[in-house]
Amino acid sequence: MKRPVTGKDLMIVNMGPHHPSMHGVLRLIVTLDGEDVVDCEPILGYLHRGMEKIAENRAIIQYLPYVTRWDYLATMFTEAITVNGPEQLGNIQVPKRASYIRVIMLELSRIASHLLWLGPFMADIGAQTPFFYIFREREFVYDLFEAATGMRMMHNFFRIGGIAADLPYGWIDKCLDFCDYFLTEVVEYQKLITRNPIFLERVEGVGIIGGEEAINWGLSGPMLRASGIPWDLRKVDRYESYDEFEWEIQWQKQGDSLARYLVRLSEMTESIKIIQQALEGLPGGPYENLESRSFDRKRNPEWNDFDYRFISKKPSPTFELSKQELYVRVEAPKGELGIFLIGDQSGFPWRWKIRPPGFINLQILPELVKRMKLADIMTILGSIDIIMGEVDR
């Protein structure tokens, strides 16, 4: 980083990587002129674990537990993108029931991610009370995850061709009760937060991004939709069963931190609508496509035995990825999560490139904080919503 040539004495401040508002091990080298930000340089890589290289040395079923460590607050989306790629390469059809359950889990994960963004974001700008209310609702979502998958986080629930297990008895009623309860709580958030004059002073007009600027920077998710671009991959790509439900893209025109807050708050309400429709119209039938377990009998006859595949239900590492390349993407809570996958007729991917939304969205931070106050850095960084496990991979 070059020191700006000015006649004033500037101060260089290190924020992070242990600062509580960095939301992980992010380090910012901030150049200050008094309280005004002159320059900001993000330093990444403290949580780099070589996730792409690990993928190239694992079968897909072996790699699934790893992907939940990317964005560890929205693990259903990392699992979804990991199984969607091989499903498209192998032309594997997912049963309708499994697709509906996937949608339910994805939207619950979106709500949990937005809640865990909202609580610390409010704490960053000085509002402590909403933090505890928001974490109470998040616990209810995690209770639903634990009942269905056995894990509160790192669920390992998605499988190639379906899901790991069907929904347990009574889970649907419990989830519907949560939906009714949560809609009333969103109204409480609006009363407590959205109309609070102190909150509005901190976020209104701070970190403004125009629509064309957002596109040029490659932003996605709430960052893009808050800048006046109604772009949502659930509507554009129509993956899973999203085109069978009625819901609206939530977007704002202002492009500031307040607009990004409003988009995420409205998205939680839309997610509840999708979950309610999916639960009420949940079809019967199988929850996995057993044909996805079919392999080359000549090469590995013991892995195709009835006892191995259907009695013990052991996943075989011989699922071959056909020799072609593919880009798959989903609308994660933070934006467009994608993978570029190249198969070479073997059990391991030849190339596995991750497109993390948090990494792309973080690139605009230095532009947003220049000429702002030091205290606005926390507001702007919090409104971007990053998880360093996904940024560093």
UniProtKB/Swiss-Prot annotation:
Name of the protein in its database record: NAD(P)H-quinone oxidoreductase subunit H, chloroplastic
PANTHER family assigned to the protein according to its UniProt record, in alphabetical order: NADH DEHYDROGENASE [UBIQUINONE] IRON-SULFUR PROTEIN 2, MITOCHONDRIAL, NADH-UBIQUINONE OXIDOREDUCTASE 49 KDA SUBUNIT
Class of the enzyme per the UniProt entry, highest EC level: translocase
Classification of source organism: Eukaryota, Viridiplantae, Streptophyta, Embryophyta, Tracheophyta
Domain of life: Eukaryota
Keyword Lipid metabolism attached: no
GO MF annotations, alphabetized: NAD binding; oxidoreductase activity, acting on NAD(P)H, quinone or similar compound as acceptor; quinone binding
Quaternary assembly: NDH is composed of at least 16 different subunits, 5 of which are encoded in the nucleus.
Name of a matching Pfam family: Complex1_49kDa
Record's keyword terms, sorted: Chloroplast, Membrane, NAD, NADP, Plastid, Plastoquinone, Quinone, Thylakoid, Translocase, Transport
Membrane disposition: Peripheral membrane protein
Purpose: NDH shuttles electrons from NAD(P)H:plastoquinone, via FMN and iron-sulfur (Fe-S) centers, to quinones in the photosynthetic chain and possibly in a chloroplast respiratory chain. The immediate electron acceptor for the enzyme in this species is believed to be plastoquinone. Couples the redox reaction to proton translocation, and thus conserves the redox energy in a proton gradient.
